[in-house]
Structure formats: C-alpha cells, structure tokens
Amino acid sequence: MFGNQAPQLFLKESFNSESKTMTTSTQQFDSKKVNVYGHITSLLFKFTTTITKGTGTINTSASVLDAFGQITIRDKNSRPVIDEDSSRFPITRKILSLADTPQWQTFKKGEYDAGSALTDTASAQVHSMEIPIDVNLEDQPISIEWVAGVLSDVLSTVGTASATCQLQVVVSSIVPVGESANLATRETRRIYSFTRGALATEQEIQGDLPTGITIDNVTLGVTTDSNLTDVTLKPTGKNIGLDRLDRTAIEAKENRAFFDGHTSGYHTLCIAPFVVGDSTVFKINPSTSFTPRLFIVHRGVR
C-alpha cells in the first residue's frame, strides 16, 4: 500500500519520574537515563502539579510550569551527536538547557500548549507541551535532568499548604523502512500539533505549514471513538482514498492515554506521504462530529 517510502512513527513513554515534594528551598537535579534510540522527531513533556491548600492560597497568576525549575537534556556522556553524512556540514545537537522557569512561548506556534493559570483548588492541574528535537541519535541514549521549584512559585500564601510535581516525557521517533531508509534518516522531520474545534462536516485544516513539504502521516487525538469510524482526507482538495481509521495502529501505540486521559486518544490515519501543494494543508470530512487534536509528521529541510 505504501511502497518503500513510508516511515513508521513510534510514540513511547520513556521517562516517568517520581513525584517531588516542593519545599521552601531549591532542590538538586533529578537525573534519569532515557533509553531512546533512532531518529527522534520530538520530546513531549507532561507536567503535573498537585497542591494541598491547607491554610495557603494558590497563586492564580501562576501556571503548572511555575512548579518546575531548570530542565536539561543531554546525550550519553554529554557528547554531541554529529551527522554522519559527509556530504553536508556536520550538525551538532546542542545541549538543551532551559534555565529557571521554562518560557515555552518562544517555541513555534503549534508546538506547545499555552500554559493556563492555576486555579485556587486542591485538585491536580496538568499541562502538556512538545519540544521538537530533530536528530538521529543512532545508539546514543539521552538523559533528562530537572529540578522542582519552590512552594512560593505556586502559592501566594504558603501557610500549611503542600505541593508535589512530576515530569513525564513521551519520545516520538521515526523509523524509515524500505529502500529509502538510509536517506530518510537524514531528513528533517518534525511533529506539528494543534487543537481544532469540533468537526461536523468537511473542514479545511490549516496549521501554518509551508507549501512544498511532505507530510508523512496524520494522527488524530480524540476523546472518544465510539462513533468515529470513517474519515476522508483530501490534501489540496483531492481525495486520496482514506477509508477508515486504522484500528491496528491504535492498538500498537504505547501509552496512548498520555495526552487526554482517554484510551481512545490516538488514531493514525492510514495514508501514503503527500506533498502540500497550496495554503490548504488538507481537508478532513468526518462521519460524525468530533473535536480532535492533530499531530502532523512532516519533512522539511535542515
């Protein structure tokens, strides 16, 4: 069906730290090895903060991210990874270090979720975001180090309040297959994601992607799939023959409940790669109304 050009996308939870108790002082790094191999397209971070108010007051101008301090991503032994293709300049993956409170708004639109303010409640408040990293790690695992913030970062009045925070990371990697595998590993691939309002009829999907790029696959993140059985995909207005959601792919996904808390979350549309020919990324015509989050894996140029 796909020929030799179709890559395979794998999504796996690779880092799930223990909860850290927030205190009134800065904590030391918590470092864990993340054994991830192959071509990483993105790291997807999930931040969870649980606050017990007591006599304290939650700072409603703060966000879940304020509970987290510095985050550093390193390769094995902190060595840079060099692109082995001698026909290009060597590409070194820089160490990503986000000092103090991460400022996600500096990332490209569609690659993060804007942090919402904390509410004055004792229930857990969760924020998820993506950091796109395009690098072929080959056999080099990466490690993630992070520190918890202090209580005053999320509380305007501490009192007897207590709080914990936890970091989870899902790694998305792409594994090319077939004759083009050797070349494909050196192409830039990124996950571009965005939320979309309810789709009831055929809708044009625009995600600010440039024309001329190749889209490898499209994944829909939905809260329920009880009625969602047929979706038509029409790049540049032409139906390319998508008939049904690939249920096999759904079962193959690991930790597919990571984003929305529902086991029906991921649906990878069974399509061949296609090129964006105009300002319309593609159109989706669902069989019934649903509200998706879209993940687009596309190729670009380094």
Language model features with spans:
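Beta-strand-centric surfaces of beta-sandwich/beta-rich domains
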Residues: 1-302
